[in-house]
Curated annotation (Swiss-Prot):
Lineage top rank: taxon: Bacteria
NCBIfam families the UniProt entry points to: TAT_signal_seq (TIGR01409)
Signal peptide stretch: 1-32
Protein name, as recorded: Glucans biosynthesis protein D
Amino acid sequence: MNRRRFIKGSMAMAAVCGSSGIASLFSQAAFAAESDIADGKIVRFDFAGLQSMAQALAKKPWGGAPGPLPDTLANLTPQAYNSIQYDAAHSLWNGVANRQLDIQFFHVGMGFRRRVRMFSVDTTTHLAREIHFRPELFKYNDAGVDTTQLEGQSDLGFAGFRVFKAPELARRDVVSFLGASYFRAVDDTYQYGLSARGLAIDTYTDGQEEFPDFTAFWFDTAKPGDTTFTVYALLDSASVTGAYKFVIHCEKTQVIMDVENHLYARKDIKQLGIAPMTSMFSCGNNERRVCDTIHPQIHDSDRLAMWRGNGEWICRPLNNPQKLQFNAYMDDNPKGFGLLQLDRDFSHYQDVMGWYNKRPSLWVEPRSKWGKGAVSLMEIPTTGETLDNVVCFWQPEKAIKAGDTLAFNYRLYWSAQPPVQSPLARVMATRTGMGGFPEGWAPGEHYPDKWARRFAIDFVGGDLKAAAPKGIEPVITLSSGEAKQVEILYVEPFDGYRIQFDWYPTSDSTAPVDMRMFLRCQGEAISETWLYQYFPPAPDKRRYVDDRIMR
């Protein structure tokens, strides 16, 4: 799965940005957008025209991988690339009075070879001008770039852009679009975490995964005092083209994105991923296999949350499996899903570099009927925090054929907590460890004679306390094995209940065990549903080894 290295290794995958379709679509006219850096021809622009462009482009052959960059850019190290800074004096909306938002651009170079085109749009006249690359827009500092190789190369374009919000208009960005169709945002902590994508193609098939590119962006000029702006994007790849509209609300404690896309299939697509997101889970309370560090937990996200079309809420803790796992959770018109980072306690991470306790959650809220399909989750084995190893997206049930046209509307919430939560009791944490002994005797004078794995799931909220006198019943379903020593424990420090059970194997199989549990009181569900996937060790590993040396 080396293709994942591209995400945190700063390698943008190739896709086409055919310049022939963009300039020819519009006619020249007057222009009045408040941008001092837009220097291209004046052209007309609107979203309907962008949709027509994407549809026309889908009927043409894909343009292929991006061309070579000048050597001085292609050979940059990550450290050298990061030292190239955009000159804030040339920001996109530097001339807008009382601006609350501003845009700066990323330089092409290193793995970011796609030459992305940028346009400034006057929202009153719907007229646009391209912003061409020129070295004076950047500060090269000690990057070692030979700027003489860049002179006159106005077609270099840019690698992406980022958004700044007052009072941090030139210091701390809140939104970033960089590499293929990747983008991300922060909450009020200003800490980036997981990423979203415009589209995912063939993520888990017998073929090569395809990474579409955003090849051009059009920015509606932000109004004075406004914290919301609109950006349009053209997406292109070997299999599909797309027209995207992002209305981005940079609020005080979160960033909200209203996304509308129109997709045009060039060819048959085995697996299409809508609203995809990419995250990292190395280790946590439930999975300690590769966590031999000073950090108790290392992850951008700790769970997949789903609000199904039938109203059921699901919590599915993430894993770092030894073998790649792909799970599809079937649904019909989902109400929402996302990868969440709900544990915000610094002491649970002890990380002063990654600040995982500050990383945002990402919640997808469909704004139209999506029909039948599945929330798909792929978990890739990883040895550490430098590689993203979790992918999640909506996969439509209907097969995508060449010539098909699709459209999706959804809202993305980048925030500490999702905008909605179950009114029932919710899963706070999942823990696993040695089983087969009474709680409070861990593990006693000697290890248990029979091997077992213990699971402890903490529930909070809802009507748990009111239900307790009537009787709380854990309803546990397992795909294999047996659940024994089931206990219900009230835990005063978090004012909730811990459901604890030991899993005992009933065969030598090492196939993943699908676990499902919810709480019931007098026949009624009183909690969201906990889903988990456990990977039993080989039979010869199902024993406890006492390695004490007593003399």
